[in-house]
C-alpha cells in the first residue's frame, strides 16, 4: 500500500474444495480478528474443524494467558472445533502457507493499491476470481466453486452478517484440539 500502511490478512481455505476467503485487517487486535473470521465464515460457511496456528490472538491473551480467548469462544459458540498446530511450525499449515504465497504473488505484487479500502475490495475480487477460475489437482482439475457444487457438503452459515458483540461468554460445551510435537527420544 502506498504510504507504508501496515496491515495483516486473515486467509482462510477449505481443505476439501480449495475455496478461499481473504480479509485484510489493520491490527491484530481481538476485535479485528473476530470480525475478519466472521466475514470469512459468512462467505465460506462455518467449518466443522478450523485449523489455526498458535498465535496468541487465536487462543488467549498476554494479560490472561490461561484464559479462553475470544476467538476460541467464538469458534466453540458456533459449533466449530479449533485445531491448534504447534507454535513455530508453519509447515503444519502447508495449504494456507501455499495460498498466502499465491495471494502475495498474484495480488500484492501485481496490483498498486492506494489505501486500505482498495485492499479490501481487491481481496474480495481476488477471492471471487480464485474460487471460480483456479484449478487444483486435488479437486480433479475443477475450480473450487465447481468442487463445492459437485460435493455433497451442506454448508452452515453464521446466524447473522454482523459478528457477535465482545466480550463473548464462556461456552458451556464444545471441544478444541492441540497438536504437539513429540520427539522420538520422548524428551
Can you describe what each PLM-predicted range is?
Residues 131-187:
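C-terminal, beta-rich DNA-binding module of retroviral/retroelements integrases
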Amino acid at each position: 500500500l502506498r504510504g507504508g500502511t501496515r496491515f495483516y490478512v486473515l486467509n482462510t481455505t477449505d481443505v476439501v474444495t480449495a475455496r478461499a476467503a481473504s480479509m485484510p485487517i489493520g491490527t491484530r487486535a481481538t476485535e479485528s480478528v473476530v470480525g475478519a473470521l466472521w466475514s470469512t465464515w459468512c462467505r465460506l460457511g462455518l467449518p466443522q474443524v478450523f485449523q489455526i496456528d498458535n498465535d496468541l490472538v487465536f487462543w488467549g491473551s498476554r494479560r490472561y494467558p490461561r484464559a479462553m480467548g475470544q476467538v476460541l469462544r467464538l469458534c466453540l459458540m458456533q459449533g466449530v472445533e479449533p485445531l491448534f498446530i504447534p507454535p513455530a511450525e508453519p509447515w503444519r499449515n502447508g495449504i494456507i502457507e501455499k495460498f498466502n504465497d499465491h495471494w502475495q504473488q498474484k495480488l500484492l505484487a501485481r496490483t498498486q493499491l492506494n489505501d486500505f479500502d482498495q485492499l479490501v475490495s481487491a481481496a474480495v475480487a481476488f477471492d471471487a476470481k480464485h474460487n471460480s477460475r483456479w484449478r487444483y489437482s486435488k479437486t480433479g482439475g475443477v475450480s473450487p466453486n465447481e468442487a463445492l457444487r459437485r460435493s455433497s457438503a451442506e454448508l452452515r452459515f453464521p446466524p447473522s452478517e454482523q459478528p457477535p458483540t465482545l466480550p463473548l461468554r464462556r461456552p458451556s460445551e464444545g471441544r478444541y484440539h492441540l497438536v504437539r510435537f513429540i520427539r522420538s527420544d520422548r524428551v
